[in-house]
């Protein structure tokens, strides 16, 4: 009788432990994050060059156009997005021919390197992998462009808030990292053609009371400092009614703040935001 009682006690203990472990596991389930149906406006990505470097910008565009025609750009897009998202048959935004005295392409050919400036925390366009190597969609595009141009790609991480200064002082040859084309940037840089469509989205925790842009009133909203997300938000009347605006160095950090519950909403490029959410879901 004692032996039977002891066995029953052990069985009950095992069952209780299993229930406890199951409960602990479910309590650690990660929160889900959703994108609001209403966005803060559509835009396009482009490659930014110094205003006078038209010849260089046109050569890079020539190689990109060739990659679109021969399918290489679609192959790279499929790798990162699972579909071809490259814009096709788009017009030049500025000059489609360079002045005779423009030696910007010759300088790149002579030195043999093409320095790409980027925010290295901007997945999937350009970011560091588990080996601390900068990878991404834009990096793959630029690598192929440089291969066709016969020069070496040099990836140079920069402070995104000072990107225009980095370009103007010659520390980098272009800004190629999910760079949204805005009127202000068009006035300060040379862009050939846009290559990807984008929009500014709002990410919130699933079940949040924030359902529309207007619901941001009184809320704590985070975004990347110096980004087009800030421009898009400032262009909306709700920007004057926020509880607090939090500007941080990069989007990965802003997303971490959202997951930690320290901000209520995250304004970000759709390409980046959906990638971050999809990585969390895996």
Identify the residue ranges that each predicted region occupies:
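Extracytoplasmic small-molecule ligand-binding "clamshell" domains
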Residues: 56-59, 63, 67-75, 79-83, ...
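C-terminal motif of bacterial Sec signal peptides marking the signal peptidase cleavage site
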Residues: 19-23
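Acidic, polar ligand-binding/catalytic clefts
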Residues: 30-39, 143, 147, 152-215
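A ligand-binding cleft/hinge motif common to bilobed small-molecule-binding domains
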Residues: 25-41, 162, 179-187, 234-236, ...
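Ligand-binding clefts/hinges and TM-proximal coupling segments of bilobed small-molecule sensing domains
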Residues: 32, 39-41, 62-104, 110, ...
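Short loop->beta-strand "edge-of-pocket" segments that line small-molecule binding or catalytic clefts
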Residues: 112-118, 213-230, 241
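Bacterial N-terminal signal peptides that target proteins for export
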Residues: 1-11
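A bilobed periplasmic-binding-protein/Venus flytrap-type ligand-binding module shared by bacterial periplasmic
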Residues: 43-62, 200-210
């Amino acid at each position: 009788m004692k032996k039977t009682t002891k066995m029953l006690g052990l069985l009950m203990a095992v069952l209780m432990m299993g229930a406890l472990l199951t409960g602990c596991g479910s309590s650690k389930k990660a929160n889900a994050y959703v994108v609001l149906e209403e966005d803060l406006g559509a835009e396009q990505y482009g490659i930014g060059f110094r205003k006078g470097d038209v010849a260089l910008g046109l050569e890079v565009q020539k190689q990109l156009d060739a990659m679109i025609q021969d399918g290489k750009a679609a192959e790279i897009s499929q790798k990162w997005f699972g579909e071809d998202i490259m814009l096709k048959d788009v017009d030049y935004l500025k000059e489609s021919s360079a002045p005779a005295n423009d030696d910007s392409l010759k300088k790149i050919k002579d030195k043999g390197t093409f320095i790409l400036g980027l925010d290295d925390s901007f997945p999937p366009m350009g970011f560091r992998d588990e080996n601390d190597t900068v990878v991404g969609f834009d990096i793959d595009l630029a690598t192929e462009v440089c291969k066709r141009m016969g020069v070496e790609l040099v990836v140079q991480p920069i402070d995104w808030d000072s990107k225009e200064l980095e370009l103007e002082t010659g520390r980098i040859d272009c800004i190629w990292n999910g760079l949204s084309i805005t009127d202000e940037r068009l006035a300060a840089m040379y862009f050939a053609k846009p290559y990807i469509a984008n929009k500014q989205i709002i990410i919130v925790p699933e079940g949040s009371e924030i359902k529309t842009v207007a619901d941001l009133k009184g809320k704590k909203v985070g975004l990347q400092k110096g980004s087009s997300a800030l421009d898009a938000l400032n262009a909306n009347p709700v920007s004057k009614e926020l509880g607090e605006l939090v500007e941080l160095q990069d989007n990965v950090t802003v997303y971490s703040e959202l997951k930690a519950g320290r901000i209520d909403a995250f304004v970000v490029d759709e390409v980046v935001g959906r990638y971050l959410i999809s990585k969390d879901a895996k």
